[in-house]
Amino acid sequence: MTAVKEPIALLGSPAAEGPSAVVLLDEQVRHRTRHRADRRFLLVARLASLAGFLIVWELASGTIVRPFFISSPTAVVEALVEWIQSGELWFHGQFTLLATVLGYVSGSLAAIAIAWPLGLMRRAYRITEPYFLIAYSVPAVAMGPVFILWFGLGLTPKVVLAAYFVFFIVFVNTVTGIQQVPRGMLDVTRVLGASRTALLWTVILPSALPYILAALRVTLPAAMIGAVVGEFIASNRGLGYLTRAAAAEYSTAGVIAGVVVMSAIVLTMTLLLRPLGHALRWQQEVKVNRGTV
């Protein structure tokens, strides 16, 4: 009788690991397929809704609403083209972008540097908390004239105001992230003989990092707002100044064009920061704390 040779499954292949591995692999493939389909649907839906909005806006301008109030997409595009051809967009945009980036970075670093030791020393945080609460209760826009009086009319007050808009959001979330570390985890790590430095890098930092990154992702618009508010108050350059000049000329298209450019800058910078969130997918989703200090 001739022996029947059965196929030998390769080590590590789905066949060698049993039916459960095949089912798991199929489920992963279906999940990826659904994810790609959802992303395509979202992209198409967003583009379609944007196109519909622009069409309705264009049709409503001059027929339902006076162009003075809402302008029109074609007029906004014409204003943008004029700024690009004259070089105004790049000239003013670079100052706003510089103030936004410097304010964002300096405000975030200052917030983390101050919040980190206070988060570790709860008694010190409770002592200083009222002072941060008082500073946080002051409307950030109201600090614009103060910073201009202190630092003059150059780039510095715009950077400081942008940093002020960023500081408290990052500060509150950093302190929250540090204080959310489970006490039991700290005790177990100490019992195992971990040094203070090891405790900081292996337990506290990984637990607080999602809170910090969540704050960093949402404070970019705040930094842009701070820089533009400073340009609105007193400046002869920047997108805030360019938009204010358009408003002084009663150019609705110019005002909307300035808003579009600022939104595009913030959106681009936010997309550049998105990989920071993907790097911590294993962490639980964290909501940014915008509440009191």
What role is predicted for each listed range?
Residues L102-F132:
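Transmembrane-helix boundary motif in ABC transporter permease subunits
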Residues R122, P210, I256-V293:
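C-terminal transmembrane helix and the adjacent membrane-cytosol boundary/short C-terminal tail
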Residues L133-I169, T176-G177:
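Generic hydrophobic transmembrane alpha-helix motif, especially the helices
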Residues V77, S86, W90, Q94, ...:
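Alpha-helical membrane-protein architecture signal
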Residues R30-D38, G62-S106:
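Periplasmic/extracellular loop-to-transmembrane helix junction in inner-membrane transport proteins
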Residues P130, N173-V218, L239, T243:
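Short cytoplasmic-facing helical segments at TM-TM junctions of multi-pass membrane proteins
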Residues V160, Y164, R196-G230, A257, ...:
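Transmembrane alpha-helices
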Residues R30-S61:
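N-terminal signal-anchor/first transmembrane alpha helix
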